[in-house]
């Protein structure tokens, strides 16, 4: 009887494990995620910290994210699968990012979002700690036309956090603050950028950083007087950019993967 129960328990565990395991993600998607990590490093959006994820193409409630490591060193072997709650499906002893809940909770709250970038973009951080709003100063940052809300972690986690989104509850609060915006600033921390594709998320993350630099320069040069894109200009430029951003992606990816060899 004991032997039978042991066999039965083993069978149940095997079935449960098989049920949790998703079909293998498209290798091309994994390659693009590796490229995204390296592009963001090459473009100065991330350094040793920061991360980017993409929805699983065959199991949409799951997502792909590298193990806890510097983005500029990520390879295909480092990509892991996570469930909707941020649990690693098959960790194999690998360390995971403390802030994976940024990704899990945004995907959970916003089914239309297919990719998430979290960074500590240096030029962006000042806009999260001052009253100056991040607004589009040129056509490639037109997606900022609707504004970028600022997430205040004290409102969700009190005044004694380490500023990290290390719990599902904090991740959910960030997802609510993001709303339908493509970018949310995180006071004293960085920002999160989202998009309906991995390529567009990378494009937006790069040009969020570029816009922040240009806006700061324009404000100084113009002594606070800057002509920003209006709503109509921003909407039209965003539509145009969606059709041509692959040009930047192809260039960035080729360079990023070439340096990886």
Residue ranges and their predicted role:
Residues 1-4:
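Positively charged n-region of N-terminal signal peptides that target proteins for export
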Residues 6-16:
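Bacterial N-terminal signal peptides
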Residues 20-261:
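Glycine-rich flexible loops
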């Amino acid at each position: 009887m004991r032997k039978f129960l042991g066999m039965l328990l083993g069978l149940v565990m095997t079935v449960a494990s098989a049920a949790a395991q998703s079909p293998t993600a498209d290798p091309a998607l994994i390659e693009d995620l590796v490229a995204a990590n390296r592009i963001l490093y090459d473009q100065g959006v991330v350094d040793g910290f920061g991360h980017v994820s993409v929805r699983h193409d065959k199991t949409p409630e799951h997502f792909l994210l590298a193990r806890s490591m510097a983005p500029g060193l990520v390879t295909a072997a480092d990509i892991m699968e996570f469930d909707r709650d941020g649990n690693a499906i098959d960790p194999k002893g690998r360390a995971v990012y403390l802030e994976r809940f940024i990704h899990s909770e945004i995907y959970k709250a916003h089914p239309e979002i297919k990719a998430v970038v979290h960074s500590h973009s240096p030029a962006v951080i000042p806009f999260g700690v001052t009253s100056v709003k991040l607004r589009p100063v040129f056509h490639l940052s037109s997606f900022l036309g609707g504004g970028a809300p600022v997430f205040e972690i004290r409102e969700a986690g009190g005044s004694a956090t380490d500023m990290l989104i290390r719990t599902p509850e904090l991740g959910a609060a960030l997802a609510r603050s993001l709303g339908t915006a493509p970018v949310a600033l995180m006071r004293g921390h960085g920002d999160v950028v989202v998009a309906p594709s991995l390529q567009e998320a990378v494009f937006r993350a790069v040009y969020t950083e570029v816009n922040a630099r240009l806006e700061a320069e324009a404000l100084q040069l113009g002594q606070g007087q800057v002509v920003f894109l209006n709503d109509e200009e921003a909407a039209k430029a965003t539509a145009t950019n969606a059709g041509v951003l692959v040009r930047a992606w192809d260039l960035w990816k080729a360079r990023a993967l070439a340096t990886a060899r």
